[in-house]
Amino acid sequence: MSENQQHTPSAESSAPSQTLPAHPTDAQRPLLTDEQLAHLPAQHPLRAGTAASSPMLQALTGRPSSHRPVWFMRQAGRSLPEYRRVREGIPMLEACLTPELAAEITVQPVRRHKVDAGIFFSDIVIPMKLAGVNVDIVPGKGPVLDRPVRTLEDVRALPELTESALDPIREAIAATVEMLGDTPLIGFAGAPFTVAAYMVEGGPSRDHLRPRTMMHADPAAWHELASWAARTAGQFLRAQIEAGASAVQLFDSWAGSLGEGDYRRYVQQHSAETLEAVREYGVPRIHFGTGTAALLPAMHEAGADVIGVDYRLPLSAANTLLNGAVPLQGNIDPALLAAGPESLYAHVDDVLAEGSAAPSHVVNLGHGVPPTTDPQVLTDLVRYIHEKTTN
């Protein structure tokens, strides 16, 4: 028994059950319509496997589940010693575009922690890289473009992403799905604003001043750039779904830098374009951003089926903002992972109680797993959540 287990509160203590029960007809109706299923390949897990009945897919679609499902953003990464071993000497983008390596990295946290879903190991700049944009990930800094995109001429010079360029993604997804078995895979892409912000800045930024200025100073260039980012993200997600992903998440890491007015005027339509690109498949579409409490209704209106909530806003407050209309995901504070078992589990109990207000709740962090996290903390946390919320 680990030290964390010795100090873990009993999972038999007052445990919130899996959220408010769905209407009986919700639980009985098929996860996907015949028309939606027709868009998926015959071998897709939602057609040929048990993914549709998994706790993750049940919760993502607002249905009761056998326990509160859990996965972690950045669960595949530097917190795992096995990840560090297989990545040794291999640049990030090369790892993402090597199908067998991307598949292995995706499966590692499922194998170790017994989380309820894998999240595809990739990066938000992969679609632009595959399109032919000269971008690299610099260790200790992040994505850096050889040439920032700051004028309408720059935007119109951008190459379009071809379907054949996505073949490594399809191959990686197919291999991952086979390795995961009954555990569903979540695909992902960077949202148009966050991707476009990187492209305008040429790299990471604290305030995203250049893209926010561009929206107002040159709205034509901004909208063309954001539309390009929306198209490539849509293609990226479609390829993942067609190869076997059972849900997708659109990450808008930097949307919290925007006011609601600018979000609705300059961003929402482009996120909607990406989410609309995969609507026909019927898979759950999760939308997550950091610092986006004021934007949650607008993010839902863009077409999200599930809203991810960061650690700054209680889930009950998010549920109120969204009129109780949408499943929620989140929102354990990553800082608590290193705060000791007593503080962590008290916080987790609060998150579970808050999540019970929503139509359904998928447990996650309110941001990514910090690289310094002790993996055993996550393994014990998954076990605790499963035991505490089992019906």
PLM ranges: what are they?
Residues 119-136, 149-162, 189, 245-263, ...:
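Glycine-rich, proline-tolerant flexible connector loops at the mouths of alpha/beta enzymes
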Residues 63-94, 124, 129-141, 145-151, ...:
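N-terminal small/glycine-rich loop or linker at the start of catalytic domains
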Residues 2-139, 345, 375-391:
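N-terminal basic, low-complexity leaders that serve as flexible interaction/assembly modules and, when applicable
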Residues 94-97, 155-166, 334-338:
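The substrate-binding groove and active-site-proximal loops of carbohydrate-active enzymes
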Residues 140-178, 183:
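A gly/proline- and charged-residue-enriched helix-loop-helix capping module
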Residues 165-391:
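Active-site loop segments of alpha/beta catalytic cores
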Residues 41-45, 90-91, 157-160, 236, ...:
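N-terminal start-of-chain detector that recognizes signal peptides
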